[in-house]
């Protein structure tokens, strides 16, 4: 209850801008950073917590930083950060140590009957999904953005076997991704195949469904 009520954020910020960029920490982010830096003043930036360090090193200040990790591993993404202007939007599933650590935050209740029973309507409700890119996208939708660009959302390993972008706090080959069953799927635009794992593939399917369900609200 110490966080900024989500409904207040909506009342103050909804439909103020049309263009949003959702930034994730996939391997392709590295090559997209120069363009993002050049256009950072042309759009509102939603940053997955894992990509925060990469943006900070380029002098890019995101408007929103999202997190929904139920473990405290994400503490590393926020430690020793100079940025105090971004609004940290956290899921109700976010680990309590991170909730207490961060200032300028809004803890948002998931769009679920279980949470609606608490009658804390000022702090809800949003479809947070199962990963931060989903959360960032639905947050941008809730704020009324009409054009939402997704970058760094590979959901696949690159040709060198990297799971994350250069500069990721846990390394480009994050060990947490190595022991999950792998499979090959068609690459973006159907150009060949890429290696992914079952969790990422599930994220991809859910994201594609999310985009399709909201194609009248926002262009992807």
What is the predicted function of each stretch?
Residues 1-46, 53-220:
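Metal-ion/cofactor- or nucleotide/acyl-coenzyme-handling active-site neighborhoods
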């Amino acid at each position: 209850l110490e966080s900024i009520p989500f409904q207040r954020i909506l009342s103050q910020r909804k439909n103020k801008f049309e263009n949003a960029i959702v930034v994730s920490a996939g391997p392709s982010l590295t090559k997209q950073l120069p363009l993002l830096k050049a256009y950072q003043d042309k759009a509102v930036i939603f940053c997955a917590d894992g990509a925060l360090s990469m943006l900070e090193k380029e002098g890019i200040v995101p408007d929103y930083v999202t997190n929904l990790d139920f473990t405290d591993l994400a503490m590393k993404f926020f430690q020793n950060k100079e940025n105090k202007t971004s609004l940290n939007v956290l899921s109700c599933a976010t680990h309590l140590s991170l909730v207490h650590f961060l200032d300028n935050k809004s803890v948002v209740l998931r769009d679920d009957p279980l949470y609606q029973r608490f009658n804390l309507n000022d702090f809800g409700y949003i479809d947070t999904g199962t990963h931060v890119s989903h959360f960032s996208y639905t947050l941008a939708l809730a704020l009324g953005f009409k054009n939402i660009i997704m970058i760094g959302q590979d959901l696949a390993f690159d040709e060198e076997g990297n799971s994350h972008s250069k500069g990721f706090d846990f390394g480009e080959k994050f060990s947490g991704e190595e022991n999950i069953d792998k499979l090959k799927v068609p690459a973006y635009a159907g150009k060949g195949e890429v290696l992914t794992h079952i969790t990422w593939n599930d994220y991809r399917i859910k994201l594609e469904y999310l985009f399709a369900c909201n194609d009248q609200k926002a262009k992807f």
